[in-house]
Amino acid sequence: MPKIYRIVGETTTGMKFKIEVTAEKPYDAIEKVYSLIGSRHKLSRVQIKIREVTAVQPEEARSDSVKMLMAIDRVIKY
């Protein structure tokens, strides 16, 4: 069952971020953040500094998209 992780960090360009993602392990959540920030802002991994990774309860999540993903109890593939 995936968990919700809140990742806090900043980039070398001075941009601070706080992102919530779903992942199985903290390492997977960090990889997802590297991918998201890197593709959105054209930054390499060296330019992204992760400061904090915390597991968050679904009730504490701020992102609506993450809340909706966690509400899904099954996926049917045709």
Curated annotation (Swiss-Prot):
UniProt keyword annotation of Transmembrane helix present: no
Assigned protein family: Belongs to the eukaryotic ribosomal protein eL20 family.
Entry-linked InterPro entries: Ribosomal_eL20, Ribosomal_eL20_dom
GO process annotations (BP): translation
GO MF terms held by the record: large ribosomal subunit rRNA binding; structural constituent of ribosome
Origin: domain of life: Archaea
Complexes and interactors: Part of the 50S ribosomal subunit. Binds 23S rRNA.
Coiled coil, from the record: none
Gene label: rpl18a
One Gene Ontology term, aspect cellular component: ribosome
Transmembrane segments: none
Keywords: Ribonucleoprotein, Ribosomal protein, RNA-binding, rRNA-binding
Protein name per its UniProtKB record: Large ribosomal subunit protein eL20
